[in-house]
UniProtKB/Swiss-Prot annotation:
<dbReference type="GO" id="GO:0005737">
    <property type="term" value="C:cytoplasm"/>
</dbReference>
<dbReference type="GO" id="GO:0010218">
    <property type="term" value="P:response to far red light"/>
</dbReference>
<dbReference type="GO" id="GO:0045893">
    <property type="term" value="P:positive regulation of DNA-templated transcription"/>
</dbReference>
<dbReference type="GO" id="GO:0051457">
    <property type="term" value="P:maintenance of protein location in nucleus"/>
</dbReference>
<feature type="short sequence motif" description="Nuclear localization sequence (NLS)">
    <location>
        <begin position="32"/>
        <end position="35"/>
    </location>
</feature>
<keyword id="KW-0963">Cytoplasm</keyword>
<keyword id="KW-0804">Transcription</keyword>
<dbReference type="GO" id="GO:0042803">
    <property type="term" value="F:protein homodimerization activity"/>
</dbReference>
<dbReference type="InterPro" id="IPR037766">
    <property type="entry name" value="FHY1"/>
</dbReference>
<dbReference type="GO" id="GO:0005634">
    <property type="term" value="C:nucleus"/>
</dbReference>
<comment type="similarity">
    <text>Belongs to the FHY1 protein family.</text>
</comment>
<keyword id="KW-0805">Transcription regulation</keyword>
<comment type="function">
    <text>Can activate transcription. Essential for light-regulated PHYA nuclear accumulation and subsequent PHYA phototropic signaling processes. PHYA-specific signal transducer in response to continuous FR lights. Mediates the association of PHYA with HFR1 and LAF1 in the nucleus in response to FR conditions. Contributes to inhibition of hypocotyl elongation in continuous blue light (B).</text>
</comment>
<keyword id="KW-0597">Phosphoprotein</keyword>
<dbReference type="GO" id="GO:0016607">
    <property type="term" value="C:nuclear speck"/>
</dbReference>
<dbReference type="GO" id="GO:0031048">
    <property type="term" value="P:regulatory ncRNA-mediated heterochromatin formation"/>
</dbReference>
<feature type="short sequence motif" description="Nuclear export sequence (NES)">
    <location>
        <begin position="43"/>
        <end position="46"/>
    </location>
</feature>
Amino acid sequence: MDDADKSCSPSLDHSDINDPMIVAVESLDTSKKRKLHAEESDLLPLPKHFCSEHQASLVNSSCPSSVIDYAECSYAMENTKTSDEASSSASFTGPSLYMFKDSIYSTGSSSSGYAATSSIEQCFSKVDHKTQEDTQDFTHMEFIYHDSEFAVEDLQEVLNPVESYILSSARWSVSNQDSKEATTKPTIDQEFEQYFSTLMM
């Protein structure tokens, strides 16, 4: 260290160790990588009460509630992840939590592990409940379709009028309009197909 650095930072000797001002100044050394609590709060996810207030404001918006529930669940999983990381940051032998939708496995014992798994199970049950409600909503589409003006028979009549017939080869339809089209010369493919169809008979 050069002389300027020595003059800026106070030195600790055994007589000054009980002085709280010197200890406080030493703990605020800016060259260290340790982050202050205010800096860490920007990196942490939003508190849960903020998410619930935000959800209440989104009730009248166009965002479906299943998306909001999914966002809450992902927040709960992130919160669980950060709390597990904080508890095992001292060593890598701390409890780790592996979560799946149908089953939850925990290696090691942790009091927060049960709370985390129960909150995640609740989130998955909310999302499953919403998807079941959505599928029930689509079952009514069958009745709406039958009441519409375009039924299956109507669509078939539009696509294939009563006077037109489809050949067995299903390449083109034959109708009364073919007499008008007979004046036009058939394409080479049509001539080829007609020639071989007569040979096969």
